[in-house]
C-alpha cells in the first residue's frame, strides 16, 4: 500500500505545512501507516485565516439565494462522493465502513441541506421605539472568520 501525502487546503490550493514537517497517520484497525499529514503551525494558521478573511469579503456580500446554492453544491458534491468519504473515514478512525455512508456521510449531507434551507429563512424583528419617530430593527450580518477545534472527529 502506498503512503499518501496529505496537504492543507488553503486559498483553493493544496499546500504543505510551512515547516515541511509531517506526521504519520495510522489506520487504527491494522496499525499501518497509510498517510503523512502536515504538521501545521502558527504560520499555516495565519495563512489560512488570511485566505478565509479575503474570501469573506465576497461571501458576506452574497445574497441568501447565492449562499443557499453554494451550500447545496457542497451537499451534492459530498453525496456524490459518499462512498469515497466513507472509505477515508473508516481508514482514519477504524469505524466499520458498513455504517459510515448512511449514519455519517449522508447525515452530514442532510445537515448541510438543512442549513442551506435556513439561509433563505431570514428573520427580522422590529424592536421597541427608542426615539420618537424612529423605528428600530434587528439586522443579522456575517461577522467574519471564526475557528473551531472539535474533538473525536466530530461533527
Positions of PLM-derived features:
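Conserved small-residue-rich beta-alpha loop and adjacent elements
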Residues: 125-155
Amino acid at each position: 500500500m502506498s503512503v499518501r501525502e496529505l496537504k492543507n487546503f488553503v486559498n483553493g490550493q493544496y499546500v504543505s505545512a510551512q515547516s515541511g514537517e509531517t506526521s504519520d497517520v495510522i489506520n487504527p484497525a491494522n496499525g499501518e501507516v497509510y498517510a503523512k499529514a502536515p504538521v501545521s503551525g502558527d504560520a499555516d494558521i495565519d495563512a489560512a485565516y488570511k485566505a478565509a478573511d479575503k474570501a469573506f469579503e465576497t461571501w458576506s456580500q452574497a445574497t441568501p439565494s447565492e449562499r443557499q446554492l453554494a451550500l447545496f453544491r457542497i451537499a451534492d458534491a459530498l453525496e456524490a462522493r459518499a462512498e469515497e468519504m466513507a472509505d477515508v473515514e473508516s481508514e482514519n478512525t477504524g469505524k466499520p465502513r458498513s455504517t459510515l455512508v448512511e449514519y455519517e456521510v449522508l447525515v452530514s449531507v442532510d445537515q448541510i441541506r438543512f442549513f442551506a434551507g435556513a439561509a433563505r429563512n431570514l428573520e427580522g424583528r422590529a424592536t421597541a421605539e427608542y426615539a420618537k419617530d424612529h423605528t428600530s430593527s434587528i439586522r443579522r450580518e456575517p461577522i467574519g472568520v471564526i475557528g473551531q477545534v472539535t474533538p473525536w472527529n466530530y461533527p
